[in-house]
UniProtKB/Swiss-Prot annotation:
GO terms for molecular function: ATP binding; four-way junction DNA binding; four-way junction helicase activity. Residues 156-204 are annotated as: Domain III. SMART domains: HhH1. InterPro entries: DNA_helicase_Holl-junc_RuvA_I, Hlx-hairpin-Hlx_DNA-bd_motif, NA-bd_OB-fold, RuvA, RuvA_2-like, RuvA_C, RuvA_C_sf. Keywords: Cytoplasm, DNA damage, DNA recombination, DNA repair, DNA-binding. The lineage of its organism: Bacteria, Pseudomonadati, Pseudomonadota, Gammaproteobacteria, Pasteurellales. It comes from Histophilus somni (strain 2336). This is Holliday junction branch migration complex subunit RuvA. Homotetramer. Forms an RuvA(8)-RuvB(12)-Holliday junction (HJ) complex. HJ DNA is sandwiched between 2 RuvA tetramers; dsDNA enters through RuvA and exits via RuvB. An RuvB hexamer assembles on each DNA strand where it exits the tetramer. Each RuvB hexamer is contacted by two RuvA subunits (via domain III) on 2 adjacent RuvB subunits; this complex drives branch migration. In the full resolvosome a probable DNA-RuvA(4)-RuvB(12)-RuvC(2) complex forms which resolves the HJ. Residues 1-64 are annotated as: Domain I. The gene is ruvA.
Length: 204
C-alpha cells in the first residue's frame, strides 16, 4: 500500500493533481480542504495517501494531514459511503467541522453536502458518533483571509469561474447548481481555489 508520497507538483486542476515522484507521474484526487494547502506548480509537496482498487480503476487519494486521511477511512467504512462521497464530504467540511456536526447531530448541515441525503446523514450520525475523540484537537480549517489573492483580468476571471465550476461538478454538484454557487461568491480578486472555498462555505 502507498501511504505517503513526496514529489514535484506538475499539474493541479481541482480536485485532481499530477505529482512527479522521481520521474513517475502519480495522479491523485484530493478533497478541497487539502487542495487549498498545495504549493504552486513546480514546488515540492508531501501527501498522505489512500489507495482504492476497483474493477474499473485504481484510484489514489491524497491528504495534507493524517487526520484527514483517518476521517476519509472512517467515512468509507460507513454503509453507503464510497470514496467519491467521502471526498465530497471532506471538501465541504474540515475535520473539526465534520466531527462537530456528528457530535452535535447537525443533520441539517450534513444533508447540504452533495450526495448526502437524509438516510445517509442519519447513518453517518449513528455509525460515527463518538469515534473521533482524537481528531478534533487541531483545526485544519484554513480561513479564506489566509489565502493569497491575485488580481484577475476579465479573461482570467472567466477562467477562474470555469475551473471552480468544474471542480464543484467533480465533487458531485449539478452543473447549474455549481455555476450558481460560484457566481454567488464571484469577486475579481479571488483565485479558483478561493472561489471553490467560498462557494462550499456559503452552501453550508
Amino acid at each position: 500500500m502507498i501511504g505517503r508520497v513526496t514529489g514535484i507538483l506538475v499539474e493541479k486542476q481541482a480536485p485532481e493533481i499530477l505529482l512527479d515522484v522521481q520521474g513517475v507521474g502519480y495522479e491523485l484526487l484530493l478533497p478541497m480542504t487539502s487542495f487549498y494547502n498545495l504549493p504552486e506548480v513546480g514546488q515540492e509537496t508531501t501527501l498522505f495517501t489512500h489507495f482504492v482498487v476497483r474493477e474499473d480503476a485504481h484510484l489514489l487519494f491524497g491528504f495534507s494531514h493524517k487526520q484527514d486521511r483517518s476521517l476519509f477511512r472512517e467515512l468509507i467504512k460507513t454503509n453507503g459511503v464510497g470514496p467519491k462521497l467521502a471526498l465530497a464530504i471532506l471538501s465541504a467540511m474540515s475535520v473539526n467541522e465534520f466531527v462537530y456536526a456528528i457530535e452535535q447531530e447537525e443533520l441539517s448541515k450534513l444533508v447540504k453536502i452533495p450526495g448526502v441525503g437524509k438516510k445517509t446523514a442519519e447513518r453517518l450520525l449513528v455509525e460515527l458518533k463518538g469515534k473521533f475523540k482524537g481528531l478534533q484537537q487541531t483545526d485544519f480549517f484554513i480561513k479564506s483571509s489566509h489565502l493569497p489573492g491575485i488580481k484577475c483580468s476579465k479573461l482570467d476571471q472567466s477562467l477562474q469561474l470555469d475551473e471552480a465550476v468544474s471542480a464543484l461538478i467533480a465533487l458531485g454538484y449539478k452543473p447549474i447548481e455549481a455555476e450558481k454557487m460560484v457566481k454567488k461568491v464571484l469577486k475579481a480578486d479571488l483565485t479558483s481555489e478561493q472561489l471553490i472555498r467560498e462557494a462550499l462555505k456559503a452552501a453550508l
